[in-house]
Structure formats: structure tokens, C-alpha cells
Amino acid sequence: MGGDFRHFSSHVSLLLLFLLIVKSSSSFTPADNYLIDCGSSDETKLSDGRNFKSDQQSVAFLQTDEDIKTSVDSIPITDSNASTLPLYLTARIFAGKSTYSFYISRPGRHWIRLHFYPLNHPLYNLTNSVFSVTTDTTVLLHDFSAGDTSSIVFKEYLIYAAEKLSLYFKPHKGSTAFINAVEIVSVPDELVPDSASSVPQAPDFKGLSSFSLEILHRINIGGDLISPKIDPLSRTWLSDKPYNTFPEGSRNVTVDPSTITYPDGGATALIAPNPVYATAEEMADAQTSQPNFNLSWRMSVDFGHDYFIRLHFCDIVSKSLNDLIFNVFINKLSAISALDLSSLTSALGTAYYADFVLNASTITNGSILVQVGPTPNLQSGKPNAILNGLEIMKLNNAAGSLDGLFGVDGKYKGPIGGMSSKKLAIAGIGFVMALTAFLGVVVLLVRWQRRPKDWQKQNSFSSWLLPLHASHSSYISSKGGSTSRRMSIFGSKKSKSNGFSSFFSNQGLGRYFPFTELQTATQNFDENAVCGVGGFGKVYIGEIDGGTQVAIKRGSQSSEQGINEFQTEIQMLSKLRHRHLVSLIGFCDENKEMILVYEYMSNGPLRDHLYGSKENDPNPIPTLSWKQRLEICIGSARGLHYLHTGAAQGIIHRDVKTTNILLDENLVAKVSDFGLSKDAPMDEGHVSTAVKGSFGYLDPEYFRRQQLTDKSDVYSFGVVLFEVLCARPVINPQLPREQVNLAEYAMNLHRKGMLEKIIDPKIVGTISKGSLRKFVEAAEKCLAEYGVDRPGMGDVLWNLEYALQLQEASAQVDLSEDKTTMNIEMDLIPGEEMQSPSHSIP
């Protein structure tokens, strides 16, 4: 930095001049500065002043089996950052694993900037290229594809490098990889701190220096694009126009960049150049006494990561000190209360920045919302708020990845720990299951042909075989008597409507309950009658019709999320009737209420029977036998199988877990809580949707791709199966790290032949080995890493029924051997010789 000063006679003069240059310009000369225009034959000089070495000059850095390059004269791209477009006219192509290796002269953080554009090549279609890019410690891109030729792809990272930094390009099987340009550049130490404020507010987040970062958004608020030529670290700052959610409420403010000052020990031009601090957005009606909105910017991000967020402020709107005080919010959570810039900088027009780490749990809709707004009830100053710039960077996850759940070794590092699929085995199993399903359909057809004439009265087919569409059901008067079609029930009650009357009336929900009847049924909604609480409100036990117990779900008007899920549950249950789905009896919407009435499940959720009893409970819940557990799993599988295949349009439950499997007085299992359910697509394999569900049960592929299929329910059910077997929570953070996630821990032990180590000790010695083997086999298939490798619920049901047959057969044999351990062979009748259960739509 500062040039060669050896001709100065005094070392003191050298030091003074050096400090002067640093102070005045905050210039930075990187110790490592590798700029490569891949595939080019000549050096490329950009208009921003940077020189990229040609491919020939950089060949020493590359190790690859084949020398494949391509180039064009021009590309059909008009980009606002035109200075880098020459880099996309050439490319290196890799048919196999290839490596760029760079020697690092000064260890520390480095930029890794990657440029992609799929050029034409006579032998390779780069638009179809799929590949991964990693360093020795971090996955930068996993199964990446640049897509079509409509836009360039630029990726930017901050990675720690020691003596050598290697970039590995790994094409997907049968594909290629490519790269147009690579930048490896040293970064000032002060650019990223080791700690930052936490959001939600908590002790500071520490240890940032150990994380790799991907820069997702770098935005110049209130101004135009800032090119690398202006930024001392060659960064690009984009305009905030695409991100401003309410531009009508904001006003651009601009001052001369030369008037911006940097405080001692605070922000420098290396943190952000002065053009960033010289522009801002303020509130358009800042002169009003109480503006009733916030300035807001929304940026898309990925799920499953924490985010480093840097906000840039500079008071360029006030006429005097202490005239601007405002609040800062990130994802509607308080980040800074009553921010007074002048008290922090002691001057106007002075740069200031604040750093935060946003917890991954706060990201519910795939975006980050940054807001600033005036502090209410100001004693002095004018109600106003500003923001000058913002940066959002993704932190690597526990897999050491910035893109997905695979580690640098290519192994899956998600919730179940990298199981590999065996295609031939899956194909064989699939064939057998398909054949079994076909035979089941034949059996159904034969039964249909042989049905008795009075089949409707005798009910040869159970009423739950086919869906009962509520739009064709009858209204049963709450006073009893004959039924009559209820065409409209709201015409005379408009004054009492809660705003959802039209929604309810179109659903044909059956029995209508007056509010007074439900008050009586619950003793005026007595708190002692509460048997459950959720986002929708409370569930009460009540009695109707002279003693019939029911569950009464009373929606809370204060919860928007609960109301949305409440409506979804109405829509779903109005379509469905099945022995293994909780039945909807009726509803009430008087007095601004939203109340649903269900059949009462006296034995509560399955989870309570597995590990719900408290220690030293005087009335503990009896332990479920292995046979009972199998029957409960079979019933639940039947309910889910019906959801997926039995309705006119398949339904994906999306929240399968043991608290949503309820048991009646006979321990018959019924699936409940359809608040998160989605209709399956009619013509596509998945539904693109925001990720929802319960931690520990969530399908990692759904989490990763945000594409919901019925196989997501299958994954969750696989977790349930292990929960039933082991009788412990699916997530227990108090256990050692390798034991926290039940599904992952169980699969690891199963692969080692040590699964008996965590089986519920209350049933150890009662499970036949064949039954256990078939049960665990079903659970393992459900937890396959890719949905395409998981069985359907019908096939899972078949395996569970088979496991039950094996258990029953074993129980009939008088064993002379000791049955106290799981290591003793308990199946005198081999599983292979058992008669397979006939399979049909349950």
C-alpha cells in the first residue's frame, strides 16, 4: 500500500506519508490479487481499471484433464454494470473434476468472485451444465446450473484462506462444468468483525470470523448503481428501486459525496465508499406530525441459514444535531430502538454502520424485510427515518455449505446424515409393490361385482372408503329430527356475521350449532374444559345431545396465522370422511366466532402414550404394547394414504407428527390438524410453497427446494415410526450432539447394527426380530434423502401390515428361549415364509 518509498532518506518520513495516504483516501492494495479471464487468449482490461490475466498466463494455476475453451464475439446482454461484460465472452469448460489452486501470501479473508454465462460450444450445451464448486472447507455451489442465456450469473463470497486456496469444479455425472472468470482478492481485516448484534435481540453473535459468507445483496439506498471503479474494493452497489416495497412513501436525498466524513475509529471508505453515504431515502411525509408507516425494503434469501446484515447510515437530512431519531426493524423484530445518529457521530454528514446477525428461524417467507420508522411520541425533533445502504450476506450452515445440505466430500449432511440410495434395490421393491397394488385393485373389483343387492343398507364397503363431499351433505338440525338440505344459513344473521360467513356457507359444513348451545356444552368455555391450545385458539371438551362428548375448537380472532390455518382445516375436512381421519361434526359463526366441532378423541395424542407421562406421576399413562404401536401406525398410514390417493384431488398434510395422531377410546388412530395442508397438484409433481411444518419432522428436500410433494409426508411419517419405536422426542438438544436428532441417530445406529440401544426399554424383549426388521426397513425407506426414492404411503402401509403379521405369528409360538434381549432370534417362522398381507386402498 502506498507505493515504493525506498528512495526516501528517512524511515520516519515513510511512516508519516503512509499514514497520510491511508487516512486521506482509505486506499487498499491487496496482497493477493488473482484476476483470470478464463478461456481468453489475451489479457482483458476492464473500464473500471482492473486487468484480468489471459488463460495462457494463468495455466499454472489450473489442473484439468482436457483443454476445452470457447469464445464468442458478443452476447445478447445489456447489463447496467457493463464494465464486466467483456469477461463473459470466453469460458473454460471442464468435462471432469478440475482445480484452480492459488498460493496465498497473506492469510485472511479473500473475495472469491465467480462469473458464469453459458456460451455456445459445438460439443457441449452449457445451458444444461450441472456442477458443484467447493473450496477445501466450504461448498460454494451445489448442483448449480447457470440456466439460459438471458442473463449473466455473478457469485461473490468472503472465504478465509491460509497458505493455499483451491477451487474445485465438479461436474454432475454426465454433465460438464464451466467458468468465465475468477477473482481471488485479499480483503481488509476490518471488513467483517468477529461479533455482531443478534436479531432477535440476545447476547451478541460471536465467532463470525470462522464462517464463510456469500454476498447476496449490496444496495445503495436512494441512489443509482455504484460500479467497481468507484469502490476501493471493486464492489458493485445496486440501486434500491427493485427492493423498495413502498416507493410512494419515500423520497430520495442526495448530497455531494465530498462532504461525507468518516469518524476516527469508525466507518471508512473500505466499509463503504462515500457515494453510498451521500444518498438516502427519507420519509416522503416527514413533515407530518405522526407518519403512520415505515420505509421498507424486502430482499429474497434462502431458508436454513443465518444472515450477516450491515446497515449504513449518514444523517444528510437534518439541519441540526439531535433532530433525527428513529427505530430500525429486521423481519419486524426490533434491531435498534431510538437510533440517534448525531449522538453516535457528534456531527452531521458522518458515516455510521451497524452489524447484525439474523437467526434463520425468523425467515418464514424466503425474504428479509428491513424497515426504518420514526420513534413515536418524540419530545424533540421531527418524525423521520433514513437509510443509506445495506448489505446481506449468507453464513454457511452446519454442513459447511452456502448452497444446500451436502458437504465438501459430497455426502449429505442434513437431518438424517447422508443415506445413499440403492437404485436396483428400490427398483425391485417398487416392482413388487406395484404388483401387490395391482392385485389389490383386482380384489376390490371382484368384491364390487359380488356385492349384495342391498349393499347400501348392509354397507359392504366401509363408509370411509370413498370421500364424502360436504357440498352434497345435509344439514342436521341441532334439535334433531329429519334432515334437510341447508342452502343458506346466513341470510338472516348479517348483523352477527364475523366476516367469514360467505366462506363458511360455501363449504357445506353440515350441522350448525347456535353459540348458546356451545356455551352450554363447555360451561361457558370454562378454562377447566380446555384440552389443547394452538395458533387458532383453544380446544375444549364439551357435551352435546344429552351426553355425547365432542372437541370444540374456538378460533382466536387475534391470530392471523391461526385464522388462515383454521380456514384451511375447514376446506380440507369438508371434503373428507375416513375412519382414520378426525371427523368434523359442525360449526358455529355467531357473534364474530369461528368454532368447529369435532369428534372427541378420548385418549389424546399418540405422543402422550410414548413419553408423555411425567416422572412420579400417580396416574401414568399405560405403556403401549408393540402390537398396539403397530396397529396405531397402520391406522395412521391408512389415513395418510387416503389423503394422498382417495380424495378427488390428493391432499398433502404437511405437518405429520405424533401430536397430530389422535387416539379414540379403543386406541384407533386418526390423523388430525389439517391447518397446513395443501391440495396436491393435478398436473405437476410438486407444489412450490413456503416451507412450513415442524422441526425434526421436516423433509430436508422440501426444505431445500421449497417444492412440496406427498413424499414430504412420507418422510415425516418415517420420523414418526422411529419415535414410536424409541419413545423419545425427535429433537432433544440436551443430549450429546450426535444424539440430538432422533432420525439421524437411529439411522446411524441401524447401520452399525446397534439400533436396540435406543429402542424403548419398556418393550425390549417383546418385539419379534422379523417384525422389527420389517418395521425399520419401512422407516428407513421413508427417510430416503430424495423423495423419488421414497415409497408411497400405500407401500409403507403394506410393510407395516406385514410387520404386524410377523409379530402375531411370533406371539403364537411357544418359545423356550429367553426373550429378554433383542439379540436373540425370536422368529421361528422366517419372514420370507410369511404370507404377505393383501393390499388395497384402505
From Swiss-Prot:
GO molecular function terms listed in the Swiss-Prot or TrEMBL record: ATP binding; protein kinase activity; protein serine/threonine kinase activity; transmembrane receptor protein tyrosine kinase activity
Keywords from the named record: ATP-binding, Glycoprotein, Kinase, Membrane, Nucleotide-binding, Serine/threonine-protein kinase, Signal, Transferase, Transmembrane, Transmembrane helix
Keyword Kinase in record: yes
Gene3D superfamilies, per the entry: Galactose-binding lectin (2.60.120.430), Phosphorylase Kinase, domain 1 (3.30.200.20), Transferase(Phosphotransferase) domain 1 (1.10.510.10)
Sugar-bearing residue positions: 81, 125, 252, 294, 359, 365
Family annotation (Pfam families): Malectin_like, PK_Tyr_Ser-Thr
Record-linked PANTHER family: OS07G0166700 PROTEIN, PROTEIN KINASE DOMAIN-CONTAINING PROTEIN
Record's protein name: Probable receptor-like protein kinase At5g61350
Source organism: Arabidopsis thaliana (Mouse-ear cress)
